[in-house]
């Protein structure tokens, strides 16, 4: 195979390669075996025409296109490997020469990864809006939330206050006409929870059981029901009951109800503090990592990012997200219906920061290459086991789905991120 690659820009070039006679013969054999099944010739049963008779009747050239389709993927991959390039999109392939008895010559217009000039990526100084410190107030807030979760609702005769729960009947209308989904009965609504349209809950503060009030609101402009978006509505609302939370006593008994692994309130506070320390420490490390990566990317120089890489990243991110939804039993159609969005909306959402994600991945890849990371079989095995546990899949299935080269690439990327993050200093 003869191979050459000539760049026409930083991210585009022409790959020229040939297909030798032995490979062509293999392709012709495959092509003949495929097409002969549909050929009927007098004197032969359908599909039983000989190769010699076929060549005499149609000419061997009739098999060229099918033969090329059979051998091109392997030939192109071999040419790419020999030229040591990394295409990032499907090539545009043209046949330069295809004659009987000669090697076939082809050209492919390919898009490749851009040249990356790294700047500083170690010992970077970064600022983060995060802290590992856990305050007494945070522990008390966690405790109060747990106490609230075990609160009981008791009917009250006085007026509803923010935080109370009202049990209501309501009928909504726009311009005097009731609309679908605008009616409810014995609906429990915690005032201040933000469950209803903005402005609705505030108008029920001060009401008492047995009262009927007219609640006037305006639907948000981005409301999922387009026929209601931006419109004024009237809800005739009857308050059936007003209930207030009765908080349990904050003592050792409540502590045991909240967490059966503790015996006292002080033990519960200590456990909450430890959990907060762990979560805040993780969030702090994530913030440092993010800031350090952003700094390393900013220090690098990339001449241009091909549009094809942006498009590929958008589709990859969308497929990953929708695939995750399907694992939870939510089909794409169901997701778009629930959220009131469309595939175009999701595309625009991921397109907004696709350039940043591609740029970041390119720089991290370049750092991994600069550090010449190697990956052991033990590391690959550990990565497979980690993924199997993460996605609740058998190890064997992960091994089939993910090629070793891809796993090694991902491990190298993680090592590059670790170098960037662990050497960073926080201002």
From Swiss-Prot:
EC number in record: 5.2.1.8
PPIase FKBP-type domain: residues covered: 163-248
A single GO cellular-component term on record: cytoplasm
Keyword Cell cycle: yes
InterPro entries registered for this protein in UniProt: PPIase_dom_sf (IPR046357), PPIase_FKBP_dom (IPR001179), Trig_fac (IPR005215), Trigger_fac_C (IPR008880), Trigger_fac_C_sf (IPR037041), Trigger_fac_ribosome-bd_bac (IPR008881), Trigger_fac_ribosome-bd_sf (IPR036611), Trigger_fact/SurA_dom_sf (IPR027304)
Coiled coil: none
UniProt entry keywords in alphabetical sequence: Cell cycle, Cell division, Chaperone, Cytoplasm, Isomerase, Rotamase
Keyword Heme in record: no
NCBIfam families listed in its UniProt record: tig (TIGR00115)
Protein name per its UniProtKB record: Trigger factor
């Amino acid at each position: 195979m003869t191979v050459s690659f000539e760049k026409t820009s930083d991210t585009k070039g022409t790959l020229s390669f040939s297909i030798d006679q032995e490979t062509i013969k293999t392709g012709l054999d495959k092509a003949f075996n495929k097409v002969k099944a549909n050929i009927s010739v007098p004197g032969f049963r359908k599909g039983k025409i000989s190769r010699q008779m076929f060549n005499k009747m149609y000419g061997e050239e009739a098999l060229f296109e099918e033969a090329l389709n059979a051998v091109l993927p392997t030939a192109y991959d071999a040419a790419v490997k020999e030229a040591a390039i990394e295409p990032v999109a499907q090539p545009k392939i043209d046949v330069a020469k295809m004659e009987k008895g000669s090697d076939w010559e082809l050209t492919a217009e390919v898009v490749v990864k851009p040249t990356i000039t790294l700047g500083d990526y170690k010992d970077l100084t970064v600022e983060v809006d995060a802290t590992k410190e856990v305050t007494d107030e945070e522990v008390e807030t966690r405790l109060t939330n747990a106490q609230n979760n075990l609160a009981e609702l008791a009917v009250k005769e006085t007026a509803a206050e923010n935080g109370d729960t009202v049990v209501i009947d309501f009928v909504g209308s726009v311009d005097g006409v009731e609309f679908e989904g605008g009616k409810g009965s014995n609906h429990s609504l915690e005032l201040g929870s933000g469950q209803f349209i903005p402005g609705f809950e505030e108008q029920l503060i001060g009401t008492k059981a047995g009262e009927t009030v007219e609640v006037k609101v305006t639907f948000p402009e981005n409301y999922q029901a387009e026929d209601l978006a931006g419109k004024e509505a009237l809800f005739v609302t009857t308050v059936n009951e007003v209930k207030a939370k009765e908080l349990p006593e904050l003592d050792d008994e409540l502590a045991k109800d909240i967490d059966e692994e503790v015996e006292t309130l002080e033990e519960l506070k200590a456990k909450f503090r430890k959990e907060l320390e762990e979560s805040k420490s993780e969030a702090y490390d994530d913030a440092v990592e993010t800031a350090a990566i952003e700094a390393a990317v900013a220090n690098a120089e990339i001449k241009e990012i091909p549009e094809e890489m942006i498009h590929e990243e958008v589709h990859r991110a969308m497929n990953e997200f929708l695939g995750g939804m399907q694992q939870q039993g939510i089909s794409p159609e169901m997701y778009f219906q629930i959220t009131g969005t469309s595939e175009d909306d999701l595309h625009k959402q991921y397109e907004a920061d696709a350039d940043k994600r591609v740029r970041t991945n390119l720089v991290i890849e370049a750092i991994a290459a600069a550090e010449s990371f190697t990956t052991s079989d033990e590391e690959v095995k550990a990565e497979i086991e980690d993924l199997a546990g993460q996605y609740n899949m058998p190890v064997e299935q992960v091994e089939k789905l993910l090629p070793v080269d891809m796993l090694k690439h991902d491990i190298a990327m993680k090592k590059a991120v670790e170098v960037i993050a662990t050497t960073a200093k926080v201002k």
